């Protein structure tokens, strides 16, 4: 059901009148249409359009694009942030808050800042996990800003030393910083992540950019109702969480990525995650909307005072976060140019909201959805459907769409104001969910859609979307569901990296693929483009990493051909540099016999219950080069495993100990890993035999 009919009938009548308005908007405010040698703000400007007015590289000559240089980076957990460029230097962030500064023209590393991370003995799982995820950094005239182990760091661009460090969350309370900070108005803004465990309340902080002084905090959910609320807003929000809600949930609703600053109105827009635990059956029975979960929130950037919110999903059970990329633009609404917010959260809908009031303007879905029957055309509120409500059917398999991975995750969209088109890296991952009849524990299969018998197939697309008509213009299918962020240019091109390791260019009008280059590693980062000395450079970071890998589903975002090292790559017309050939080593024959199926299945439950798969992959296949493929491990001796898994021997490396795991549980874990190791080895040997026989 489309939720845009009422206003678009009016809008179509004024479409021709609005053409002139659109042309005048081609050079957007706040530097979104980048023409210089700098790309110092995330997405190229405060509006975060990921659009450049550069057009030296265009549809007629993009076939001549070649690699100018590449640099292999010491980043075991991959690079996924949008590279920023200021004064001839590329700044790239990586885990655990590392800053790389490289020369724009040569790729030579100029300096690297590595933060000191000393894990507290009480560091939570999320605190450890978060140090393996970094989605970028921020830059201003003085400093580079990055998150690390719940701290916001400012590092001088001149001295390359720490200017200040400020605490923003508590790694002992299931919190971490994984998103890129944003800068504006002399301030630095940062949110936090909970890893979906909800150990503490989500909040967004503002710091003075020069001194690191904490200026304000906005809590995204109410706290313990037995204590005074921080303000009347949270007191009112508490009424939406149900009776005795603090008995069921003590956190979540994290603003872990999307933050957008509007200089003209001094407004900060950010998105929030969902409540914890995931299942509504495990939260207050009479819970309502649970504000401000899954919301777009606008606050005064100077004070943190609330302006408005728009909630995309109420009382959610499928982790359909609204923390995805938020853009600002000027669009013709009923014949008048209006400042709008555009966003495509996980729930599968693309929204256009009034930036001043938060009022719903329009929305429609860009991937299949079954969690709602549609949206109210006036308010945008979802019309209830129980098709995705697994918590109402314990013991039965349910496939919520688009589900936990989302129709669009954190990877950046792009907006071409000249064509008035948004380009969405969309995802469809049908995840089967079965809630235990006894405990309510969720059993999820993220790889269901890759099975031959799947009724709904896993799919990734690059979607060109008309935000006025809420209509698809074209769709380019990708080989894997999780792919990189997008860049649009005035050269009539759209650039995107892919999970299978390709960097590609498309015709912005038709979706025709015009150019492709295999970089050897998975790409989640959005590209950057700048011009220097008459050459237009396209810059992109590669290397397995990011939330998708860290959520234990690496097969959705890479394959055997895209597991190369983390790299920074620059392309220009006439580039002639060649990449070295990389290969994946064979699986070694496991050193222990095959386990029984029953023991391995017991180990699978222990593996999942302790969130081992979130770092090491649900099939123990490893998420990033920095988190080992356990199927290849030479540390499966039970005594060695005990020292690592139970006693925490690798705690300094970010691997927590699990003292609650028994010796019997450890044996079951060993059996599960061995089963996966033998499966990988046997499959490899079968393929080798088949290849030999075919010759």
From Swiss-Prot:
It comes from the Bacteria. Heme c binds at residues 612, 615-616. Its cofactor is pyrroloquinoline quinone; heme c. It is found in: Periplasm. This is Lupanine 17-hydroxylase [cytochrome c]. Catalyzes the first reaction in the catabolism of the alkaloid lupanine. It dehydrogenates lupanine, which can then be hydrated to produce 17-hydroxylupanine. The gene is luh. Its EC number is 1.17.2.2. The keyword Transmembrane helix does not apply. Binds 1 PQQ group per subunit. GO terms for cellular component: periplasmic space. Residues 1-26 form the signal peptide. It comes from Pseudomonas sp. It catalyses: lupanine + 2 Fe(III)-[cytochrome c] + H2O = 17-hydroxylupanine + 2 Fe(II)-[cytochrome c] + 2 H(+). Belongs to the bacterial PQQ dehydrogenase family. Keywords: Heme, Iron, Metal-binding, Oxidoreductase, Periplasm, PQQ, Signal. Pfam families: Cytochrome_CBB3, PQQ. Transmembrane segments: none annotated. GO terms for molecular function: alcohol dehydrogenase (cytochrome c) activity; electron transfer activity; heme binding; metal ion binding. SUPFAM superfamilies: Cytochrome c (SSF46626), Quinoprotein alcohol dehydrogenase-like (SSF50998). Monomer.
